[in-house]
Structures are given as structure tokens and as C-alpha cells.
């Protein structure tokens, strides 16, 4: 494994802490897909890298702001639906990605789970 492993492990632990969050690998062993609930609703995709990247959904306004940052780009295949990909190469990027994962969970989770996550 690379030096990026601790960052990937920290992102994985963060994503799995939300209510009814689970990990799946529908795109192969190198893509850690985080889903919410019993269905197939994704809220984040982690690639261990290097570099570690995370793909997630944002609101239109947040997406516009995020895309101004040098470590964020439109996600391949799903970018037109509001998804972006961020490379985690330093601490500020890591902190921003954690907040964006939280936002993506909020956007994708059923209402009852959203309320329990923030109560």
C-alpha cells in the first residue's frame, strides 16, 4: 500500500459513521462505494490512490464553489448530475472532503436518516 492509505482509511471510517451507511464494491475492489439505506443510493466513492480521490454529490451552489479549487474536478460519467471528484493531497483538502461527504449524505439519505444523523 502507499502512503495514502491512512487518508483512505480515515475517509472510509468517516463515511461509514453515518446512520445506515454501508460499503459496497460494484465497480471492483479498488472503488469503495458508500451507500445509504437498503437500496443502491450512493453518496460517495473512494479510490485509495495515490492520490486518494473521493467522488460525491453537491448542490449546484456548492459545486460551483468547489470547482474553483485546484484539487476538485467534475466527476467522470456523473458530473452532469452534480457529482465532483476531489484529490486529497493535504490537510485542507481532507477537511473539505469530509464536509462534502457529510453534505452528499444529507442530499442522498432518506429524510428520517438525515434527521437522526443531525439530532
Q: For the regions a protein language model found, what residue spans apply to each?
A:
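Charge-dense, helix-prone N-terminal extensions
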Residues: 1-119
